[in-house]
Regions:
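A conserved structural/catalytic subdomain of Rossmann-like adenosyl-cofactor enzymes
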Residues: 84-268
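Conserved S-adenosyl-L-methionine
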Residues: 3, 7-92, 97-106, 112, ...
Length: 268
């Protein structure tokens, strides 16, 4: 049993703060009923950051911090040595396939060493840049849930090199494939990538769930129903393998038999 101490939640692409607030709502509470959590977010757009601050206040989380600036160019949460501050839990839904991710930085000489040992993401696609920022921002036993487009699971070249390096370190422990048309502003199907740095050497594989078919149509959007969410959570927590829906896949199978390709339909 983990001792009751204040754990922090961080969202490097905070937007209006809704994901951060939901993550904070899941934190344990103390005897006085106060959540044992500190909240930190960064959002580059001034107006959106203002909205996030207001959102925190409206949800009784006014002590949460939202800082403004581009996270990849100018991360605002640093330690006393000028390196990235480490967080226990990170949630993030970054801009998909961010074409301007490297504006203002020289990735080869990144002062925060986010790409060391992994490789440089493609100039016009920042999906892995955001992912590697999260990895570098996690404590030694830190955990993260990141919403990403499916492309990061199988695209080749520089991204394949990075993906294989991440796989070799056994940091990814879960992938949940979601229905298309779930998010505003994009019809691209997304997935949740679960990261766990704690005792990574002991991890056996990635637990994959294909939840792409469980949804309700709502106008031109798709929505996850309560039962869809419940099924995902139950299956994931129990690591229950269900034919055509979920499976534990070993790192060896992914790296040796499939060249580091993590596309969920390949395995389920």
């Amino acid at each position: 049993q983990r001792q009751m101490c204040i754990r922090d939640r961080y969202d490097p692409a905070a937007g209006s703060g809704s994901l951060l607030i939901r993550a904070a709502d899941e934190a344990p509470v103390n005897r006085q009923g106060n959540a044992m959590v500190s909240i930190y977010g960064q959002e580059k757009d001034n107006a959106t950051a203002g909205l996030a601050k207001m959102n925190l206040v409206l949800h009784q989380k006014g002590t949460g911090e939202i800082k403004t600036h581009s996270t990849l160019t100018s991360p605002q949460y640093l330690d006393e040595y000028g390196q990235l501050r480490k967080f226990d839990f990170i949630v993030m839904n970054p801009p998909f396939s961010d074409k301007s991710w490297s504006d203002g930085i020289t990735p080869e000489n990144d002062v925060f060493h986010r790409f060391d040992g992994y490789g440089i993401p493609p100039e016009k696609n920042g999906d892995w840049a955001w992912f590697l920022h999260v990895l570098k921002s996690l404590t030694e036993d830190g955990k993260a849930a990141i919403i990403m487009p499916h492309g990061i699971l199988f695209r080749g070249n520089a991204e394949e090199t990075i993906r294989k390096q991440v796989l070799a370190r056994k940091y990814i422990t879960g992938i949940v494939s979601l229905p298309a048309n779930l998010f505003y502003g994009t019809g691209i199907p997304a997935c949740i990538v679960v990261v766990d740095k704690e005792n990574a050497d002991d991890h056996e594989g990635i637990f994959m769930i294909d939840a792409s078919q469980g949804f309700k149509k709502d106008g031109n959007k798709n929505r996850l129903r309560e039962q869809d969410i419940e099924r995902i959570v139950q299956t994931y927590n129990l690591r229950r393998e269900i034919d055509g829906y979920s499976r534990m896949v070993s790192y060896e199978e992914m790296l040796e038999d499939n060249g580091g390709n993590l596309n969920v339909p390949r395995y389920i």
